[in-house]
Amino acid sequence: MLRGKTVRLSVAIFIGASFLGSFRSAALGGRLDGAALHSLSSLEEMARGKIKITPHVALAEGLSAAEVPNADPLGGERVPNYIRALAQHTKAAPQFAHLVRTVLYGGSLSPETKMAIVLRVAQVYGSAYTAAHAQRWLRASESGRGLLAALKGGAEESLPSADSLALRYAELLTRDIHGVSDSDFQRVRAHYNDSQIVELTMTVCFANYFVRLNEALNLPVEAWAFEPTANVQPAGLRESPSARVALISDEEMEATRAALAASRSPQPGGLGLGIANSQRAMLRVPALAQAWREYGMSVRNGAAISRELQLHISFAVSMANGCRYCTLHQVLGLKRLGVDPKKLLAMRKDDSALTKSELAAVSFARKLTRMATVTDEDFALLKAEFGERGAVEVALQTCAFAFMNRFTDGLRLPSEDEAIRAYQEIYGAGAVARDWNW
């Protein structure tokens, strides 16, 4: 259920409780607030030096494009290393390929604007792999090449105001999930409607996911990522409507229908909320909502790590980011799994109640949350605890909440009554207002 009648998109949330402030400060020490953007020239130099690096995990070297449709969002026979990594360790490679393509070419916003958003997030974190792919995507159209030239040439002020605002929005939301102020948001709203704002936000969230996936797995940059790219317009996703407004497609109607059906058939280990408010917001862009949901379900189904461990990871990430909405959801999920309330009480303060395996997972997750990268030693320790497949799943769960924290608290989505009730049953009457100033 919605709490209140109006959902205000993307306003700053101020965390008033001292416990959360200290927890978040410790978890995110050394983060990138205020750091200069990495230049595109430096990222390209870094990327060329990463062609022959050793990844943290095995890649499906023999995988062909025929086995994973649209492995390359631009089409053709290329299979990126992020698809090879997922194919080796999960069954979710086809769904992720579809997600990438849908984020870039689905919805109503310009693909080039969304590609530039991915590039900007790569600049924030210094992700050479992500930047190489984002620039390749931009080179696949005339307008993309023009946008890329402006960014490389330091002529960002020459961009249309809507594009400049989108890039600023991406940077603010990437640096801090509460980084978009009311005034920042009102400037965005002057150029974009609610559905477009949701699409912008999902693109920023996806880029934060994508950077962490690529960096956690230490993926080598493919040599072909630097090759000239022919003009590309993938068929089947974006066809210019003759009407003055875009018509909802059969696929988008199916996405909405599928979400309604799923709410009536609760998933094992789910939260029991029906359609959560996060889903209600995402369904303003049904194609992206469906692609994200299908990918998430494909990762979760048949996972090697337990559902409880997944929730411990997402709790740690959400607490580190100061995300009210997602923290309440993780408490609800852990409570529904039967986790001892005493453990939940302790987890709000420190890690003393965690098992050795849980501590290994959440420690890794916090590092990946903070800087969007980890060391070889960090990943080796994770593999020693969970094996290679389990380590990949820990990374994917962390990435998922880099996405969800920014989407939910970034858009200031209201917590559902059921989530509030569960939280306050553990932490006391008025705990949501006390802990989250909400």
Describe each model-derived feature in a short phrase.
Residues R78-A85, S110-Y125, G154, H191, ...:
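Alpha-helical scaffold segments that form or flank carboxylate-/histidine-based iron centers
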Residues D184-R187, D194-P234, E388-D435:
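Preference for long, well-ordered alpha-helical segments
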Residues M1-V11:
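Bacterial N-terminal signal peptides that target proteins for export
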Residues S158-M202, K349, S357-L396:
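Acidic/histidine-rich alpha-helical segments that form the ligand environment
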Residues L86, F96, V100, A116-A122, ...:
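Short alpha-helical scaffolding segments that buttress acidic/His motifs in well-ordered protein cores
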Residues L2, A27-T113, R139, E222-L309, ...:
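Secretory/endomembrane lumenal or extracellular ectodomains immediately following the signal peptide
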